[in-house]
């Protein structure tokens, strides 16, 4: 059984569990996703960028035929991070095809979310204007995260990553979250 948006949209709990979005939030996203997809994949050009000689739409129809299905595929991947083989099984694709769709759709999803203005800023100087754009004045929670990572083998990379202290090497992030809406406003570079 293939996971399809038309069946999933009727089940509020499953949609939220698989995508992290409510129906109302999901309805807003396809138009922005469609616009971002059209900039990456215009209908009058082929995959390599040359002008199309034949009309678009010929050939076998893909499993991810609609914009909503492509969006659902990328949101399920982002929310659950399953193995690509499992994701392929859920959507009726092979593992290699699932990998290709992931590589193709994630930048489009990021662009669509950025166009809607819901991505957190990653530049500290732009945080204040970014928050003023949302017209909300609320308490902000500032938190730091630290994730251990393996020590690089390359001496040049070791020097860049090392703080000089004898402790495990780790990546650090600072996160600023609006306490009322739980919206991430700022996420530092890793």
How would you name each of these model-derived features?
Residues 56-61, 74, 126-129, 172:
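Short, charged beta->alpha transition segments
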Residues 1-62:
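Charged, often Cys/His-bearing segments associated with DNA-binding zinc-finger transcription factors
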Residues 83-190:
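Short, well-ordered secondary-structure "scaffold" segments embedded in the functional core
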Residues 60-68, 163:
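Structural motif
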Residues 66-82:
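Short, amphipathic alpha-helical "recognition" segments used to contact nucleic acids or chromatin
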Residues 18, 62-65, 75-76, 91-94:
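Short secondary-structure transition/capping motifs
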Residues 31, 35-42, 79-82, 107, ...:
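Short helix-loop boundary/capping segments at the starts of domains
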